[in-house]
């Protein structure tokens, strides 16, 4: 494994880039939630959902995972250059086939997703699938631990997309088409540039004999990806087809609110966990070979959990304030879903980290078994909860279904590679977090509801809506919630959850950051 200094250096760069990069989607959320109706936001979410299953079926997602694994396990620089162009050429073929067949069967996809807009669905799918031209070169950049290049490229793409979205959606008022045009321009331009760079770095000719080995690696991921898609899509599909809503427009609007809550919480995951995971997924193959690997893997999950719990608690405490301040009134009901999505991401974090064992040991078929065993629980809880409770029932159903899934995965991964998880410390961390969240409920909302009717509020200009939201802010509840966040940090610090090494590292990082800002000598 690289030195700890190198590990934290790359993590810091990925982290800063992740935070800055996620600011762009956060800036775009008010744009989407004020210029797009919930039905349009729901349509964008369904396009992303459909592209996920297409990526899985046509191995586009699997090829991205293969890029990291095969590149890191290549034994020479020449082999790494050859594997880069080999994987890229296979990816181009997969994308071409996927786009062609998606457009051919667009009528059936639209019938299932109930968007009522086949042209938007077809264009959206083609544009989203083309993002594979960006993801694989970026995966190879990550594998080389070119963290600064990775972050700057991501940042350039995010800022370009933000500027184009603002111009097309707010300036030209093109609505959902403006979002798609901005995505298409950024994807095509950066896809060409990144692909050209990989061609220069790698071998000119692909090793097609490796295609079979790559496909054999990816194929077990297809049924697992399909099962994972069914799990991920069941909430949206249940809302569309059996939710307690009158009419397709109301159901599609519910999907939009559901997608907004999911998006807000996933931003915290991207800012907190994703930068660390980008380094860890490269380093874990080397750690696996060391004698203290079981303890390193277990302690790493605890640290990762601390980071995600902090961000999940933060956004859960201020969920109502965020949604009421930055979103149009038609999106306000999404705030109630955010704490439940925070819990869902914590469960996802457990499962994701345990599933790394399957990739290290090349037993990806076990991942399939775990996901397949989860499906009956998802269907059962969705059938019981969604018809009665709608969006809230869908998120609760996911959380309930994940509990047996994690139990099954824990049993299988421990048989392949026994990890020493600090379960007691994890339980204490979650207990402290739940108590702090319950305490925050006593504080009330930090932003009052508008006294205006829906028609009066809709008649306001954008500037008047912002001023109305600002005037409704209640400072005392917000200060109390910030105090609860501070209390959470104190309890975690002094409860023994963090080791002395973790505390010393945190102090060094904070001190170095203050010195960089010239706040300390």
Predicted segments, located by residue:
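Signature of the first transmembrane helix
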Residues: 6-65, 96-103, 127, 158-162, ...
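Membrane-proximal transmembrane or re-entrant/amphipathic helices at the cytosolic face
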Residues: 444-521
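N-terminal membrane topogenesis motif
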Residues: 1-26, 78-79, 85, 208-224, ...
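Interhelical loop/hinge segments that connect adjacent transmembrane helices in multipass membrane
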Residues: 1-7, 176, 192-232, 279-295, ...
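Alpha-helical transmembrane segments of polytopic membrane transporters and translocases
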Residues: 30, 42-59, 254-273, 302-303, ...
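Helix-loop junctions and terminal segments of transmembrane helices
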Residues: 59-75, 143, 261, 265-305, ...
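Hydrophobic transmembrane helix module of multi-pass membrane transport proteins
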Residues: 20, 52, 89-234
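Interfacial segments at transmembrane-helix termini and the short loops linking adjacent helices
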Residues: 4, 106-124, 315-352, 392, ...
């Amino acid at each position: 494994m690289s030195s700890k200094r190198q590990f934290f250096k790359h993590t810091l760069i990925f982290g800063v880039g992740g935070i800055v990069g996620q600011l762009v989607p956060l800036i775009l959320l008010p744009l989407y939630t004020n210029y797009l109706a919930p039905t349009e936001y729901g349509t964008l979410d369904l396009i992303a959902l459909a592209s996920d299953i297409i990526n899985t079926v046509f191995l586009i997602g699997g090829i991205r995972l293969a890029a990291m694994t095969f590149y890191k396990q290549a034994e020479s620089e020449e082999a790494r250059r050859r594997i880069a162009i080999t994987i890229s050429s296979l990816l181009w073929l997969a994308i071409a086939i996927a786009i062609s067949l998606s457009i051919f069967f667009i009528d059936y996809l639209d019938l299932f997703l109930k968007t009522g807009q086949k042209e938007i669905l077809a264009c959206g799918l083609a544009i989203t699938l083309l993002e594979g031209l960006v993801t694989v070169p970026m995966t190879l950049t990550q594998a080389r631990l070119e963290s600064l290049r990775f972050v700057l490229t991501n940042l350039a793409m995010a800022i370009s997309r933000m500027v184009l979205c603002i111009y097309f959606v707010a300036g030209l008022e093109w609505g959902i088409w403006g979002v798609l045009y901005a995505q298409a321009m950024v994807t095509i331009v950066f896809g060409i540039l990144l692909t050209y760079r990989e061609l220069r770095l790698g071998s000119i000719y692909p090793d097609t004999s490796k295609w079979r080995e790559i496909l054999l690696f990816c194929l077990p991921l297809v049924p697992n990806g399909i099962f994972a898609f069914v799990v991920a899509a069941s909430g949206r599909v249940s809302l569309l087809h059996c939710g307690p809503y009158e009419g397709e427009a109301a159901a599609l609007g519910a999907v939009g609110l559901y997608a907004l809550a999911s998006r807000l919480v996933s931003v915290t995951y991207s800012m907190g966990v994703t930068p660390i995971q980008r380094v860890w997924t490269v380093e874990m193959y080397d750690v696996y070979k060391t004698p203290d690997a079981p303890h390193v893997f277990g302690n790493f999950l605890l640290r990762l959990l601390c980071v995600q719990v902090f961000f999940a608690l933060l956004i859960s405490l201020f969920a109502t304030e965020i949604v009421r301040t930055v979103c149009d009134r038609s999106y306000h009901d999404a705030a109630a879903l955010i704490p439940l999505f925070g819990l869902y991401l914590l469960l996802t974090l457990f499962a994701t980290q345990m599933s790394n064992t399957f990739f290290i040991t090349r037993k990806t078929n076990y991942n399939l078994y775990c996901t397949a065993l989860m499906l009956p629980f998802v269907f059962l809880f969705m059938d019981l909860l969604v018809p009665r409770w709608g969006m809230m029932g869908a998120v609760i159903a996911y959380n309930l279904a994940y509990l047996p899934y994690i139990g099954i995965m824990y049993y299988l991964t421990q048989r392949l590679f026994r990890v020493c998880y600090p379960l007691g410390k994890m339980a204490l961390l979650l207990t402290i977090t739940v108590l702090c969240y319950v305490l925050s409920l006593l504080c009330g909302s930090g932003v009052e509801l508008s006294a205006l009717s829906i028609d009066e509020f809709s008649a306001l200009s954008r500037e008047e809506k912002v001023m109305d939201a600002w005037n409704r802010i209640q400072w005392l509840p917000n200060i109390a919630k910030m105090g609860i966040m501070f209390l959470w940090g104190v309890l975690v610090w002094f409860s023994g959850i963090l080791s002395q090494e973790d505390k010393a590292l945190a102090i060094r990082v904070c001190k170095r950051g203050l010195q960089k800002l010239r706040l300390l000598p």
